[in-house]
Amino acid sequence: MALVNKIKTLSSVGILAATLFLAGCQAQSNILAFTPPAPSASMNVNRTAVVSVTTKDSRAIQEIASYTKHGELIKLNASPSVTQLFQQVMQQNLISKGFRVGQLNGSNAWVTVDVREFGTQVEQGNLRYKLNTKIQATVYVQGAKGSYNKSFNVTHSQEGVFNAGNDEIHKVLSQTFNDIVNNIYQDQEVAAAINQYSN
């Protein structure tokens, strides 16, 4: 009887140890989640333009970062996608400034957000790492009376000891993303161009 109890105990301990080992070996997610901050602008009710917003992703590289860990190349992607993030940002921006966002056919002004860069370059040595992030987007306004464009750019760098991973990359890229979003929210030139060039 004592032998049976010892076998049961050892089996339970073995299963627990194997479970913990396998849990520790699970692959880290290659998705980094982003949430745009909310705009703080007060609504201007005198806006008459109905604006159609589209976003396109012109980045040369689709992942937002890549690095090597234990000899394996890790490629990171954004969730929501970069296109969805900037679509949400621009729609929130225009609504907060009093514009109505409409469909392509029912609008008298068209805004296109062209995302040119959104990513982190990872440099890793034996004892230090360096992260360089850059986000660049150009906003195009088209109306019956003319067109306008403006570029938004934000860069950040971070250095640290040993190797960078998802958490470090996410932290510096989130800071860069929040900064460019706030720059878009604080900008008044795009709203002025919509008013000027819409019919």
From Swiss-Prot:
Covalently attached lipid (N-palmitoyl cysteine), positions: C25
Primary location class: membrane
Pfam families: Lipoprotein_16 (PF03923)
One GO term describing the cellular component: plasma membrane
InterPro entries: Uncharacterised_YajG
Keywords: Cell membrane, Lipoprotein, Membrane, Palmitate, Signal
Range of residues in the leader sequence: 1-24
Highest taxon listed in the record's lineage: Bacteria
Cell compartments where the protein resides: Cell membrane
PROSITE patterns cross-referenced by the UniProt entry: PROKAR_LIPOPROTEIN
Coiled-coil parts of chain: none
Bilayer topology term: Lipid-anchor
S-diacylglycerol cysteine lipid sites: C25
Family as reported in the entry's similarity comment: To E.coli YajG.
Name of this protein: Uncharacterized lipoprotein HI_0162
Native organism taxonomy: Bacteria, Pseudomonadati, Pseudomonadota, Gammaproteobacteria, Pasteurellales
